[in-house]
Every structure is written in structure tokens, then in C-alpha cells.
Amino acid sequence: MYPAHLLVLLAVCVSLLGAASIPPQPLNLVQFSYLIQCANHGSRATWHYTDYGCYCGSGGSGTPVDELDRCCQTHDNCYGEAEKKGCYPKMLAYDYYCGGDGPYCRNIKKECQRFVCDCDVEAAKCFARAPYNDANWNIDTKKRCQ
């Protein structure tokens, strides 16, 4: 084998090892992102909701700072109920569609998928209704979320 071929093979192996260390994106969270965009008709990027208030994003504690943060708290609680039913809400895929007046779950027969889809659709619609206060994005949760 030629030295150049060995270098190419080594580069491919190193690339594959690097790719293997990237954690997979939970499918449901990708779907939830699409539901949010459907509900708010693309008026606000999904990432605006990932670090908002005390409950939007990973985890949550304390008193919600406003209506939008209460939507996130309700969504967190809904996922908690799904987990009590033995469901894996961040990993479940489900069938939905985006209509003119927002997202809907589509003919879901399996209990876990239906429950999680309902959690996500209700949260997305709640996000669309609630005012967004820029001052509540990226707050110091250690101070404000006791």
C-alpha cells in the first residue's frame, strides 16, 4: 500500500472516531422545534426559547417569571407525566401536521406517542400566545429562580 493511501485511510478513521463522539439529537426535540415554528408562523426562532426564564430549556426550578415561562413549566410537567407512564418524551417520534391555524397531532394510536405529541402541540400553541420579554432571555437563574 502506498504511503498516501495510508494517510487517507488514517484521516478517514480519525474522522469517524470524531463523528462517533457527537451525541445524537433527540428526534422529538427536533419535531418540537418544528411545532413551535408552525404555531408562531416563523415569527421567532426556536432557539429564543431554549434559555428563557426559569423553565425554558434544560431543567427548571423556582417560580416562572411570566406567562411564557409558565408554558415551559407546564411542558416540563407534561413530560414528567409521560415519563411516569413509561414513555421517553425526548426520544419519541410522532406524526403531526402544520395547518393554517397551527400544529396538530395526526391519527396517533400509540398511547405514549399521542401523549407526548399532545404535550408538544399544547406547549407550541402556548408559546405562540404568550408575550416574549427579551429581558427574560438568558437570565441569571441562580438569582431569579429560587
Swiss-Prot record:
Expressed by the venom gland. Its EC number is 3.1.1.4. Keywords: Calcium, Disulfide bond, Hemostasis impairing toxin, Hydrolase, Lipid degradation, Lipid metabolism, Metal-binding, Platelet aggregation inhibiting toxin, Secreted, Signal, Toxin. One of its GO terms (biological process) is arachidonate secretion. Its cofactor is Ca(2+). Ca(2+) binds at Y55, G57, G59, D76. Disulfide bonds join C38-C98, C54-C145, C56-C72, C71-C126, C78-C119, C87-C112, C105-C117. Residues 1-19 form the signal peptide. Residues 20-27 form a propeptide. The keyword Mitochondrion does not apply. Its main location: secreted. Snake venom phospholipase A2 (PLA2) that inhibits collagen-induced platelet aggregation. PLA2 catalyzes the calcium-dependent hydrolysis of the 2-acyl groups in 3-sn-phosphoglycerides. PANTHER family: PHOSPHOLIPASE A2, PHOSPHOLIPASE A2 FAMILY MEMBER. Belongs to the phospholipase A2 family. Group I subfamily. D49 sub-subfamily. This is Acidic phospholipase A2 S14-72F. It comes from Austrelaps superbus (Lowland copperhead snake).
